[in-house]
Amino acid sequence: MKFTLISSCIAIAALAVAVDAAPGEKKISIPLAKNPNYKPSAKNAIQKAIAKYNKHKINTSTGGIVPDAGVGTVPMTDYGNDVEYYGQVTIGTPGKKFNLDFDTGSSDLWIASTLCTNCGSRQTKYDPKQSSTYQADGRTWSISYGDGSSASGILAKDNVNLGGLLIKGQTIELAKREAASFANGPNDGLLGLGFDTITTVRGVKTPMDNLISQGLISRPIFGVYLGKASNGGGGEYIFGGYDSTKFKGSLTTVPIDNSRGWWGITVDRATVGTSTVASSFDGILDTGTTLLILPNNVAASVARAYGASDNGDGTYTISCDTSRFKPLVFSINGASFQVSPDSLVFEEYQGQCIAGFGYGNFDFAIIGDTFLKNNYVVFNQGVPEVQIAPVAQ
């Protein structure tokens, strides 16, 4: 779900891609571009993550371009120096382009619409009267968060073009009202990549479900690479395949617990240098969360290892000098994956720095972009499982 409150947009630029897939397989590649503007807020990111997961009341104890038909590229934006990643999706006939936040931590596709009484003036709005493939549904939807942000409206169906592959009759949620945090944000809605058991309206199929059932991709997978602003930004989503040029070494297969509708994994151990700072804990891979949000005890141990001080709001103040930091390393299913020292600092303000990790009073971790921009992930909805490898720098 959307956790970043941002208020300006930039132009979207196309990037070249390289995709791995078996011959004849269908896939979509969605690269990402960078926006250098916007001042991030770690506190906002923490609060929005808390709101997102509280509403579900969780209780836990060698590549190259493959010349296939069906390959499509949609530019995306790394907004606010790794605060949020969103991409352009075309909806309706004739098609209208919408900037959507791609989010593995939720499962709804919702957009601003002309039915909306308070949507942002700069948001692109879907108009049912202007699409010949619009189908009325009539059911209502509503999403509310613990921080007071919300969106609500009605369901409809229309064609959705995702990177050049046309999903027919995709259920979309048309916003009739939305909170200011959405209205003033950089995007026009959200595209959820979680499992369909957590759609706001039960029984609705996700875009990934329909890509599979309509035969638009040959494998039920998507690869995610999120670029770092410090390295020029960029990144890509690839549906039906993955890009082996974006990671180094081999992919490690990790089982997924999707019983709650999320991409749940187990982290076996966390270390800093030679010191183990945490033993086994559960986590959710969530591209829609900016930071690495840890269980309170794990966050406290990590903070001690880096000499960070608790700000009392889920964030930590940390040294701005990352040259003396060692990476934070997660051991997952027998392999090691790093959060690099530069990712341990999220924002700097008046000579003080806020850490790229925090806590939210959960007994599980929300493994957001702080981790994911350091590691390539292939999400496999069919098994389910993920495959992870360190990004190629």
Curated annotation (Swiss-Prot):
Q: Which organism is it from?
A: Rhizopus chinensis (Bread mold)
The GO molecular function terms of this record are:
aspartic-type endopeptidase activity
Q: What class of enzyme is it?
A: hydrolase
Please report which protein family the annotation says this sequence is part of: Belongs to the peptidase A1 family.
Q: Does the keyword Iron-sulfur apply?
A: no
Instruction: Report the InterPro entries cross-referenced here.
Output: Aspartic_peptidase_A1, Aspartic_peptidase_AS, Aspergillopepsin-like_cat_dom, PEPTIDASE_A1, Peptidase_aspartic_dom_sf
Entry annotation: catalytic residues: 103, 286
Put simply, this protein is called Rhizopuspepsin
Q: Where is the signal peptide?
A: 1-21
